[in-house]
Structures are given as structure tokens and as C-alpha cells.
Amino acid sequence: MSRRNTDAITIHSILDWIEDNLESPLSLEKVSERSGYSKWHLQRMFKKETGHSLGQYIRSRKMTEIAQKLKESNEPILYLAERYGFESQQTLTRTFKNYFDVPPHKYRMTNMQGESRFLHPLNHYNS
């Protein structure tokens, strides 16, 4: 099996694992430990295979999931912060506002559409 195929299989496996673990804190250290590669090497492989940086991919996937939950449910923002591994509601609010340009409570209460910034799981397109 070629190096390229091995890298693609590794990244595909990591993408699956990230999706299964979006509701927990996902640090680069934790993901690289899972992969068996150094942080530096994993980030380089991930960028090469997906076109996304690993940290940005994880952040974007979490923000997409949270935005969808805000529209689909009445779950408290504090609960979503805890559920998706943020240190506090304030940390989630700051991250969400930086990503969508509005805080979560305003996003939920308006008809704002954030879909243009949604990042759906890459494995659904690459499989």
C-alpha cells in the first residue's frame, strides 16, 4: 500500500473518530495521541488530505453542530457548552460569536442563517 493511501486511511479514521467525539474536549494532543503520530506530522497530513487545518476543522464542526442544536432545540447554551467540551458558557459564546458574528442567544432567536459557514463531516463526502 502506498504512503498516500496509508495517510488517507489514517485521516479517514481520524475524521470518523472526531465525529464520534465532537461532544468532548478535542485537543490536538488528544487527536495526535489517538492517531499515533506527532502533532506536527498529523497536522501536516490532515491539511494535505483535507485542505483544512486540524484545529480549524474541529472548531468548525463543533460550531456547526451547536448552531444546528440552537435552531432545533431549546437546550440551554450552558448545557451546549458543557456538552461540546467548552470550559464555560462564556468561552462558547466568545468562540461562537467569532465564528458566526453573533452570540448564540441572538442566533437562536433570529432567522439568521449561518449555513454558509457550516462545515459538514468530510467523511460523508469522501467515502
Curated annotation (Swiss-Prot):
Induction: By various antibiotics or by sodium salicylate. InterPro entries: Homeodomain-like_sf, HTH_AraC, HTH_AraC-typ_CS, MarA-like. GO terms for biological process: negative regulation of DNA-templated transcription; positive regulation of DNA-templated transcription; regulation of DNA-templated transcription; response to antibiotic. Residues 29-50, 77-100 bind DNA. It holds the Pfam family HTH_18. The keyword Repeat applies. GO terms for molecular function: bacterial-type RNA polymerase holo enzyme binding; DNA binding; DNA-binding transcription factor activity; sequence-specific DNA binding. Transmembrane segments: none annotated. Keywords: Activator, Antibiotic resistance, DNA-binding, Repeat, Transcription, Transcription regulation. SMART domains: HTH_ARAC. It comes from the Bacteria. Residues 12-110 form the HTH araC/xylS-type domain. GO terms for cellular component: cytosol. Monomer. May be a transcriptional activator of genes involved in the multiple antibiotic resistance (Mar) phenotype. It can also activate genes such as sodA, zwf and micF. This is Multiple antibiotic resistance protein MarA. It comes from Escherichia coli (strain K12). The lineage of its organism: Bacteria, Pseudomonadati, Pseudomonadota, Gammaproteobacteria, Enterobacterales.
